[in-house]
Amino acid sequence: MNARPLSVAVIGAGPAGIYASDILSKSGLDVSIDLFERLPAPYGLVRYGVAPDHPRIKQIIVALYKILQRGDIRLIGNVEVGRDVSVAELREHYDALVFSTGADTDAPLDIPGVDAPECYGGADFVSWYDGHPDHPRTWDLSAKEVAVIGVGNVGLDIARILAKHAEDLMVTEVPANVAEILRTNQATDVHVFGRRGPAQVKFTPLELRELGKQPDVNVLVDEEDFEYDEGSQAALAASNQQRQVVKALEGYAMAEPEDLTASHRIHIHLFSAPHEVLTDEDGHVRALRTERTRLTGDGTVTGTGVYRDWPVQAVYRAVGYASTPVKGLPFDSENHVLPNAGGRVLGEDGEPITGVYATGWVRRGPVGLIGSTKSDAQETITNLVADAQAGLLHADTDDASQVGHDAVTVLLTRRGVPFTTWQGWELLDAYERQLGQDYGEVVVTSGQSKGRERVKVVSREAMTELPRSEERRVGKECR
């Protein structure tokens, strides 16, 4: 083993990267850990992928905060690997690299017309309303009737945000630009489409039940969409969660007409496969054409040749997330992951690249929640520790002074990269919370007055400059 601590860079400061760093720090190795993040703020999809009206899920940040607050894991934010520093350079400065860059782009949907201007990626919309600094500040919400393709929780999030009254989102952490545009939202009817049946939808029961609790929003499901074959029955028998989902869907389907008086509606359509986005003579969305499907016996479906056109003026794709390639590493473009075995990244020859690892969605694809992320990180770090104990991990340099945090931050400073730190994030976090307090009370649809926990800062420049300015101010006061 080296006389100096093992130096490890973890790339990606979402849950996967933070949990991997935490597990490594407690592994018993003498280790120095730097956690890189391409955005100025940590937490990944918990900050930029969870709907703003889901503070319960955002409580995960409390656990992640406690890990980073300890100080034994150093955050280096606003640094993009492949742009500000290369993989090859990181391998010179660290004994091992762990990639946890996640999956934050939309999986493709290959149907005619999907490139129309009012066809949007669900991940892009989520990034917009969550204040991602690399996404546009504006969004067209003029459509009164909207289609959402995909029956997972992201599809429900999109439908709920579009159907919800703007004032009920003003109490969340949405940025100022998002709040302003949400007030112009014209959507009254949001149609959610899934190609299979109730036994196959990917909603979780809690998310689905929550959909029906939105003020002045009705959820409608067609009674004809409840069909089950042998495969469906087996799926329901094996999963209590799926039985709860079906029960919730049946509850919506059995609602009495006199109770469906809300001004906004979410329609869930099953056995409806997207076939084509129809446009008018100017190329703008006018309808979504779907094909009715039927079960084949094993839970899969086939088309029936029966089509229906749904008048909509916008279409959102929510058919899954995909990882993006890491410049300088092999990439499995079919599965959208870094090729790996047990978290060890594989080269073009199929052999492990010594000292390079992957964890989280970039390792296994966009499936699983926090529990899966933790077990995934555990396996990857276990293999990293084994490789370290076998003496396999060494930085690509013989100069010990070029290994680790100080050498990398000198390199970034020399290049003019305005990287952020954990201390800087705490200053920005406090600033956002103060913006929430300063906003005051908001009257929501129910008539209640509520305060705001925070208001997100969106601009990358502001996110990097605000904490630096505050650090300079505090420094002057301490002189």
Task: Indicate where each model-derived feature is located.
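Beta1/beta-strand and adjacent pyrophosphate-binding region of the FAD-binding site
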Residues: 3-14, 143-149
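Glycine-rich FAD pyrophosphate-binding loop
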Residues: 29-42, 169, 177-178, 195
